[in-house]
């Protein structure tokens, strides 16, 4: 059973991610946050398995969308898949010095999307009042930014 401390940390991390999503959505009218069905529909549109629906948070279009508008892609419309990584740490030179976790599904979706001509990128967001902002890094450029990388397994026992 998870400790109350780990539960508190999870809630805090979820709040930080929500704040980062809100910051991004308010700062860029080209961003849209699809619901679960919308994410699956986007993947279906690309011919990618729906199991990757949680491996991205937002879609960036070439046109502005309103927050309450249901996302409907126009025929041949280009878009990008965006995965948010957020922190409250002071990072004045984003994305430099950013520490984050990423799942195998995020990397696999990035690979498949890239093969289909769709950009997949991470949006590194700092919520610190003195360094609030964001930086996009395309998954194909990520290795150029990585200083160190390690594998961590998340295991569920039966």
Residue ranges and their predicted role:
Residues 64-77, 93-94, 116-117, 130-133:
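Short, solvent-exposed loop/turn segments that connect beta-strands within catalytic domains
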Residues 111-158:
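Domain-level recognition of nuclease-like catalytic cores that cleave nucleotide substrates
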Residues 87-112:
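Mg2+/Mn2+-dependent nuclease catalytic core
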Residues 1-54:
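Acidic-basic catalytic patches of nuclease active cores, encompassing PD-(D/E)XK
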Residues 39-76:
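Active-site metal-binding core of divalent-cation-utilizing nuclease and nuclease-like domains
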Residues 54, 78-80, 118:
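Residues that flank catalytic or metal-binding motifs in active/ligand-binding sites
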């Amino acid at each position: 059973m998870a400790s109350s401390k780990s539960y508190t940390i999870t809630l805090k991390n979820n709040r930080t991610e929500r704040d980062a999503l809100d910051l991004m959505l308010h700062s860029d009218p080209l961003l849209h946050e699809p619901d679960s069905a919308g994410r699956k529909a986007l993947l279906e549109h690309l011919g990618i398995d729906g199991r990757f629906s949680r491996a991205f948070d937002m879609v960036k279009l070439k046109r502005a969308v309103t927050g309450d508008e249901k996302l409907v892609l126009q025929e041949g419309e280009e878009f990008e898949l965006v995965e948010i990584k957020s922190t409250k740490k002071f990072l004045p030179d984003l994305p430099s010095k950013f520490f984050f976790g990423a799942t195998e599904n995020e990397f696999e979706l990035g690979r498949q999307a890239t093969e289909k001509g769709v950009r997949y990128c991470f949006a590194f967001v700092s919520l610190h009042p003195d360094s609030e902002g964001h930086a996009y890094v395309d998954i194909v450029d990520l290795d150029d930014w990585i200083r160190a990388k390690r594998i961590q397994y998340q295991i569920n026992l039966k």
